[in-house]
Each structure stands twice: as structure tokens, then as C-alpha cells.
Regions:
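Hydrophobic alpha-helical transmembrane segments
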Residues: 139-146, 172-223, 414-438
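Helix-loop junctions and terminal segments of transmembrane helices
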Residues: 78-95, 164, 286, 290-314, ...
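Transmembrane helical elements of multi-pass membrane transporters/channels
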Residues: 26-46, 171, 175-178, 182, ...
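Membrane-interface junctions at transmembrane-helix termini in multi-pass inner-membrane proteins
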Residues: 150-173, 310, 368-394
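Interfacial segments at transmembrane-helix termini and the short loops linking adjacent helices
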Residues: 55-58, 126-145, 277-280, 341-371
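N-terminal membrane topogenesis motif
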Residues: 1-41, 218, 232-256, 434-464
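Signature of the first transmembrane helix
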Residues: 2-11, 19-82, 122-123, 251-274
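Membrane-water interface segments that mark the loop-to-transmembrane alpha-helix transition
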Residues: 22-39, 67-70, 75-126, 140, ...
């Protein structure tokens, strides 16, 4: 049924897409379960590294949190490309069998050249990058950011291809394997004396491991269709789509995710410039705990995007869907914010240790700030589902202003967090001023059914 929906009954789509048939609900549930495990392992990594890294080891956990925030901002392109690649794969636009292999080989060669180039730039600019991120004592860790982003792009593309082939099992395993490898390798390298740099090195190493795994799984899919194509003869097929053209098609989701990533992560980097080493580590741990509702918003986004797309296609008002998604955030925020209000210190102390609890007083304010950001995230997803892009410039101006304002904010965690809250409130005001406008909707075609939500590109989820 999925093939019929995405192809709208057209002939000529390769039979290799039949891999998507079967229990799609079970596959989706398995992938969702893998995401849950991924997030649980990521949370465990945060707790392990917060306790393992001491403040006298190159800035301790505060430096690692800043480096991770830097990477998360860089990583958003990969998230958008993964979704776009999966869509193109389902529609058969990447080729099949040897044609698909040719496309992936060309893209991988381009990514290898790109990764080498940005790695050279990152090494040459390691001192300015370290200074900007606030990790002056970890210049080689700072130099890993751009190479890690290049590896992440390659991994995201490979995952997208596997998603397009319906191999959700491989995608799910790679999600869990990535976080598990990052935790194990990072912890070992940090424990043997490499400190913050060792802990951060686990990130690109985990990407390399999962790239090899995904490439092997993809090779099996290609080999499975090679026999059917062997008798066709002719020259080797060329790549079906260039990587540059592929990236251009995903520009709006990429821009939206960059804005969200900056609003979500730049405060930890700014904190490294405003606080002492010990306080920056404490703030980093507190900020990680405060962002729990962002994950709730991502889950609500899975519901919001297709439903908004469906209503848009049928000419209905999509705003009630946004209201329902916001209701999910509201319901979940009540117990979370109550815990932040009355048990902030015990919570941070239990999770990260007593040495990371100095900024626990700011947890409620930060919790409010990132609850607001969770709502902004849904508004941005809503606008992108409606194929609106004008708002991106206005929200981007807020994201640009945030680091400027935070670098001049209070040196006390609660005052600093209040500035974060004010910025998030402005961002939400801007996003919702665009989202709540009725605007034109696409009418249903006369005499025929409305276009399906599956015809409209889904919007990738943010991370972090």
C-alpha cells in the first residue's frame, strides 16, 4: 500500500521497492523503539561523562558539553539529508541495484573529498574554533568538530538510502550502535588519560563504525538485485542524482533545523565564556536536564507534519492540528516543571553528582525556556509542512541575536537562564505570529481525491 501511495499508481517503479511491503506498522514501531534506546543510551552517556570528567581535565564536562553543542549545530544538515534521501529512495529516484550503487558511490566519493577538505580547514583553524567554542585547552578536540560533521553527513546519507529500501532494522541498529560505540569508546579513551578529547573522539569513531555497517548492509541489497539486472547487459549505470542537486532540494528543512539547533544549543557554548570552569560544567549538566521537553516535541512532530500536510492538501484549516500538538507539550510540561521547581537540586545531584549541582537553581527557568522552544519547534515544523519559508529569516534573526545577548548576560546561572528564557519567548512570538495566520491553502483537485500527505516532503526532526 505504501508503494501505491507514494507512486500514486504510476507504472515503472522498480520492484526492488517491494522491500517496503509487509508489516509497516511493526517496522515503524521497531524504528521508534530504536530511537528510544538511542536516547536512553545518550542520557546514560551524559551521566557517565559528567561523572568521569573532572573540572581540572581540560574544563571537564562543561567543555565536552560545549563541544557536543558545537557538533549538534553542525549536524542538522545530515538530519535533513537523511529524510530527503529516504524520500527519493522510496520514489525510485536514486536508481535500483547497480544504479543505486553508482549513485551511492558518487555521493560517497564527493563526501570523502568534502570531509578531507573541511578537516584540513578545521586543523588549520583549530585555535580560533576552540576559542569560539570556549575550549581553549582542548584545541584538538575542537578540530574534530568539522571532520565529525562530514562523517555524520555520510552516515545520514547511508541511513536514508537504507530507509528508502525499507531496511528499518539496519537503520535502527545503526542508531543504537552509534550511541553505544560512542559511550564505550569515549569512556575508554577518557579513562586512559585523554580526558575531554578522548571522550569527544568517541563521536567520530562511532560514525566510522556505523558507516561501515550501513555500507555492508547496502551492499547486500545491491547484490540481491544484481542477478535480475545481470542479463540486461549494457554499460555500467551512472548516478541517478547528483549530491549537489539533492542538497538543493532540502534547503528549507536544513535552514529550519539550523535555526532550531542554534536556539537549542548555543547557550551551553556561551556559558563557557561567562562562567568559571566549575560553574560552566554545572550549567551544562543543568541545561541538558532542562531540555527534556524538546524530545516530547519531536515525538509530537511525527503526528503534526503528516496531519498538517493532509489538511493543507484537502483545503482544510490545519491550525487545530498545531493546537493538539501544543496540548501534548502543555500536559507533559506540568509534572516536569513541578519537579524542576521543587526538586531541582536533588535531581541534578542524583543524576550528575554533587559537583555538578551548583547551577541547579536555574533548572526551573531553563525548563520554562526550553518548554517555550519545544512549542517554537512545533510551530516551525508546522510552517514547513505548509511549505512556508518567509518566516525563516525572522526566526534566524532571533537565533543570531542569542549568542550576542548571552555573551553579555549575567555571570550568575539564574540571571543567565533568564536571558535564555527571554530570547526563547521572542523566538516563539515570531514563529507563532506566522503560524497562526490563516493563509491560503491548497484546494482539493476538482472531481478527484485530494493529494495525500505522503506526497509532501516530511520534515526531519531536530536533535540534541
Amino acid at each position: 500500500m505504501l508503494i501505491k501511495r507514494v507512486t500514486r499508481g504510476r507504472e515503472g517503479v522498480s520492484t526492488s521497492l517491494a522491500d517496503l511491503r509487509g508489516s509497516e506498522t511493526a517496522k515503524a514501531a521497531g524504528l521508534a523503539g530504536a530511537m528510544i534506546v538511542n536516547n536512553v543510551i545518550a542520557l546514560g552517556s551524559t551521566v557517565v561523562f559528567a561523572r568521569l570528567l573532572k573540572d581540572n581535565q581540560g574544563g571537564g564536562y562543561g567543555s565536552l558539553a560545549a563541544l557536543v553543542s558545537y557538533f549538534l549545530i553542525l549536524s542538522v544538515v545530515g538530519q535533513a539529508l537523511q529524510v530527503a534521501t529516504a524520500r527519493e529512495g522510496v520514489l525510485g529516484h536514486l536508481g535500483t541495484g547497480a544504479g543505486l550503487a553508482a549513485t551511492v558511490r558518487q555521493w560517497s566519493r564527493s563526501m570523502a573529498v568534502f570531509t578531507v577538505a573541511i578537516s584540513i580547514v578545521s586543523v588549520l583553524l583549530r585555535h580560533p574554533i576552540a576559542s569560539a567554542v570556549g575550549v581553549k585547552h582542548n584545541v584538538w578536540a575542537a578540530a574534530l568538530g568539522l571532520p565529525a560533521a562530514g562523517l555524520w553527513l555520510e552516515l545520514s546519507i547511508l541511513r536514508g538510502v537504507l530507509q528508502g529500501l525499507g531496511d528499518y532494522q539496519a537503520v535502527g541498529f545503526s542508531l543504537m550502535g552509534e550511541q553505544g560505540a560512542r559511550l564505550v569508546m569515549g569512556a575508554i579513551l577518557a579513562a586512559v588519560g585523554l580526558g575531554v578529547t578522548g571522550a569527544y573522539l568517541g563521536t567520530p569513531l562511532s560514525f566510522i563504525a556505523m558507516c561501515l555497517y550501513c555500507a555492508r548492509r547496502l551492499q547486500r541489497h545491491v547484490q540481491a538485485t544484481a542477478g535480475a539486472q545481470a542479463g540486461q547487459g549494457g554499460k555500467a549505470p551512472a548516478a541517478a542524482l547528483s549530491l549537489v542537486a539533492h542538497v538543493k532540494r532540502a534547503w528549507a528543512p536544513i535552514a529550519g533545523l539550523i535555526v532550531i539547533a542554534v536556539l537549542q544549543n548555543i547557550d551551553i557554548i556561551a556559558a563557557k565564556h561567562r562562567f568559571s570552569t566549575s560553574m560552566a560544567s554545572s550549567y551544562g549538566a543543568t541545561a541538558v536536564a532542562a531540555k527534556v521537553l524538546i524530545w516530547v516535541a519531536m515525538g509530537a512532530g511525527f503526528y503534526l507534519v503528516p496531519e498538517v500536510s493532509r489538511r493543507r492538501a484537502s483545503g482544510e484549516d490545519p491550525r487545530p492540528i498545531l493546537a493538539r500538538a501544543l496540548g501534548i507539550i502543555a500536559v507533559c510540561s506540568v509534572p516536569v516543571l513541578l519537579i524542576f521547581a521543587f526538586a531541582s537540586h536533588p535531581l541534578i545531584k542524583a543524576a550528575f553528582g554533587a559537583s555538578k549541582s551548583h547551577a541547579s537553581g536555574s533548572l526551573l527557568v531553563l525548563g520554562l525556556a526550553f518548554t517555550v522552544l519545544a512549542c517554537t519547534y512545533l510551530a516551525i515544523q508546522y510552517l514547513l509542512a505548509l511549505r512556508r519559508t518567509l518566516f525563516l529569516l525572522a526566526v534566524a534573526l532571533v537565533a543570531i541575536a542569542e549568542p550576542i545577548l548571552l555573551l553579555n548576560a549575567s555571570r550568575k546561572p539564574t540571571g543567565f537562564a533568564a536571558v535564555v528564557l527571554a530570547i526563547q519567548a521572542v523566538g516563539a512570538l515570531v514563529a507563532f505570529s506566522f503560524a497562526l495566520r490563516r493563509g491560503p491553502v491548497a484546494p482539493a483537485p476538482p472531481g478527484g481525491p485530494a493529494p495525500r500527505a505522503s506526497d509532501i516532503e516530511p520534515i526531519p526532526e531536530a536533535v540534541g
